């Protein structure tokens, strides 16, 4: 469906052009005018994405909508192609929403404010482009464009070990991005037909199973770094350990979701035959994420690193949902990305706000501040309950959908489903233990004399309450009425799962020796029942 108004191009170009105009904003060096300018640009971008959803997006359709296509370099198959479907539209809205709140969270930044907001706006445009472009080379360019601002935001405004964290981030993410470029070139020039990198053209190509497996493996590494998947995760705790609050919000709220989105868009949608072979591995990796990261989070004494490992654990549910051949499970993975984006952004913002008051991240140095910071304690409590998947919150719905979808997924054998659900439940049990224990150590117990005498323990200010309130509205809204979000992508998810089931039935037919365990594909997969989804 062609767009009558170029909403998506505007949502990409407005923050990028806004970033380029930052040097022209009059300012006396304190950053006040630049702050307001950046906030206005991010709000305009958010309103553009909302207008795109309300005026040009039909949730009942599974195909591409709001599409724009302009030939760029036709001899090389390069095209400016953008569009949105159920996989991308919710994440575009999430990106513009969280970025506008991150801009407000950056209000106290006074060191090099022009450069800071320039990078923030450039990052906004790059991240929206990742979800909106419909050309694999454009996707690679947007993926790389987003890396540079993150690196500089870490290296310049980070903590004591900011150079180490920023360097590790760029080495992991930029190095793994090479696999995206190689896969894009291979898929664009092979498979028959004229060279093209548009998703629709790539989906129509006839790639052999061996070719798909090779591309899938490379893309899994690239996207696994960003998700992140254990053991490709070690950059994330270091990056979160040194980042400032607004950068935290962008890392947890948006950056990790790029990996989950890319798995659905490329590995599942464009390489369905390979996905039927790799899906069990995704399930196992998801369980490893959930349990390993939960146990590691439980042992952390640094507040930022504790929440960072909690994020890794929660993203394990995304892997299980992506690996399932159930519309319910895959829909749960999508909802988990959105839910974690909101909850992760809120928790990391509160970490930054608490550090501004206590000047420490060590739980051993905290305690007894609940009496002096009652509103802050209330905000922490609600966000922690959302993170541990309390009923009535978005996290409960998304995790329940993943569990129910995988448990009823007849594409996998019953023993495998029982084992995976049992192991994943261990992570669900560990989460409230380490989160509630964290709250107790921060706010309860005896006041630390050194903490009270050397810090200004003022309660939450209106700006902070407003930011958390804006994040809690969709968290609670989705928790009470999930259709508010799931209807926006249901049709696209059902079409994706149907395609993957069809590809799996071609690879694993009901009469194939796989069921007897003789085929070179995972014996934990069985042929789905007719009509299973």
Swiss-Prot record:
Biological processes annotated in GO: ATP synthesis coupled electron transport; electron transport coupled proton transport
Print the keywords alphabetically.
Answer: Membrane, NAD, NADP, Plastoquinone, Quinone, Thylakoid, Translocase, Transmembrane, Transmembrane helix
Q: Where does it live in the cell?
A: Cellular thylakoid membrane
The EC number of this protein is 7.1.1.-
Q: Name one Pfam family in it.
A: Proton_antipo_M
* Keyword Ribosomal protein applies: no
**GO annotations of cellular component type:** plasma membrane-derived thylakoid membrane
Task: List where the protein spans the membrane.
Answer: 5-25, 36-56, 70-90, 91-111, 115-135, 137-157, 169-189, 210-230, 244-264, 278-298, 315-335, 336-356, 377-397, 418-438, 465-485
What does the record give under GO molecular function? NADH dehydrogenase (ubiquinone) activity; ubiquinone binding
Its record classes its membrane topology as:
Multi-pass membrane protein
Coiled-coil intervals: none
What InterPro entries does the database record attribute to this sequence?
NADH_Q_OxRdtase_chain4 (IPR022997), NADH_Q_OxRdtase_chainM/4 (IPR010227), NADH_UbQ_OxRdtase (IPR003918), ND/Mrp_TM (IPR001750)
Signal sequence, renumbered to the chain: none
Reaction catalyzed: a plastoquinone + NADH + (n+1) H(+)(in) = a plastoquinol + NAD(+) + n H(+)(out); a plastoquinone + NADPH + (n+1) H(+)(in) = a plastoquinol + NADP(+) + n H(+)(out)
Biological role stated in the UniProt entry: NDH-1 shuttles electrons from NAD(P)H, via FMN and iron-sulfur (Fe-S) centers, to quinones in the respiratory chain. The immediate electron acceptor for the enzyme in this species is believed to be plastoquinone. Couples the redox reaction to proton translocation (for every two electrons transferred, four hydrogen ions are translocated across the cytoplasmic membrane), and thus conserves the redox energy in a proton gradient.
Q: Which family does it belong to?
A: Belongs to the complex I subunit 4 family.
Q: What is this protein called?
A: NAD(P)H-quinone oxidoreductase chain 4
Q: Which organism is it from?
A: Synechococcus sp. (strain CC9605)
The gene is ndhD
């Amino acid at each position: 469906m062609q767009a009558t108004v170029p909403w998506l191009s505007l949502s990409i170009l407005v923050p990028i052009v806004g970033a380029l105009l930052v040097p022209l904003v009059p300012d006396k060096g304190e950053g006040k005018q630049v702050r307001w300018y950046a906030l206005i640009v991010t709000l305009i971008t958010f309103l553009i994405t909302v207008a795109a959803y309300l005026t040009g997006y039909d949730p009942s359709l599974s195909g591409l909508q709001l599409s724009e296509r302009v030939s760029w370099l036709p001899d090389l198959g390069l095209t400016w192609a953008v569009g949105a479907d159920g996989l991308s539209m919710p994440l575009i809205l999430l990106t513009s929403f969280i970025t506008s709140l991150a801009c407000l969270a950056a209000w106290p930044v006074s060191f090099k404010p022009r450069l800071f907001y320039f990078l923030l706006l450039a990052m906004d445009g790059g991240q929206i482009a990742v979800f909106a472009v419909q050309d694999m080379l454009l996707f690679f360019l947007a993926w790389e464009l987003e890396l540079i601002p993150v690196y500089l935001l870490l290296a310049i405004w980070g903590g004591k070990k900011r150079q180490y964290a920023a360097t590790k981030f760029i080495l992991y993410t930029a190095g793994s991005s090479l696999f995206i470029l190689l896969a894009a070139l291979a898929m664009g020039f092979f498979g028959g037909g004229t060279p093209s990198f548009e998703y629709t053209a790539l989906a129509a190509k006839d790639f052999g199973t061996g070719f798909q497996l090779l591309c899938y493996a490379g893309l899994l590494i690239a996207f696994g770094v960003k998700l992140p998947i254990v053991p490709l995760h070690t950059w994330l705790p270091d990056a979160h350990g040194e980042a400032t609050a607004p950068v935290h919000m962008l890392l947890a709220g948006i950056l990790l979701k790029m990996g989950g989105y890319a798995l659905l868009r490329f590995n599942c949608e464009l390489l369905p035959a390979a996905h039927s072979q790799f899906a069990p591995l995704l399930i196992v990796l998801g369980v490893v994420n959930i349990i390993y990261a939960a146990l590691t989070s439980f042992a952390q004494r640094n507040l930022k690193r504790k929440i960072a490992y909690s994020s890794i654990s929660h993203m394990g549910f995304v892997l299980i949902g992506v690996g399932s051949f159930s519309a319910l499970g895959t829909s749960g993975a999508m909802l988990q990305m959105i839910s974690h984006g909101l909850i992760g952004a809120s928790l990391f913002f509160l970490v930054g706000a608490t550090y501004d008051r206590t000047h420490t991240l060590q739980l051993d140095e905290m305690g007894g501040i609940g009496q002096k910071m009652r509103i802050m304690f209330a905000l922490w409590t609600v966000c922690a309950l959302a993170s541990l998947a309390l009923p009535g919150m978005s996290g409960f719905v998304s995790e329940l959908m993943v569990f129910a979808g995988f448990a009823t997924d007849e594409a996998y054998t019953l023993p495998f489903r029982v084992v995976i659900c049992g192991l994943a439940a261990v992570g669900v049990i560990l989460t409230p233990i380490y989160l509630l224990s964290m709250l107790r150590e921060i706010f309860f117990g005896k006041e630390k004399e050194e903490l009270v005498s050397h810090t200004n323990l003022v309660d939450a200010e209106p700006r902070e309450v407003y930011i958390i309130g804006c994040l809690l509205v969709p968290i609670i809204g989705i928790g009470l009425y999930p259709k508010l979000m799931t209807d926006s992508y249901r049709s696209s998810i059902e079409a994706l799962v149907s395609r993957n089931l069809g590809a799996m039935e071609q690879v694993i037919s009901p009469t194939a020796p796989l069921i007897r365990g003789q085929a070179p594909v995972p014996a934990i997969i069985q042929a789905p029942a007719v009509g299973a989804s």
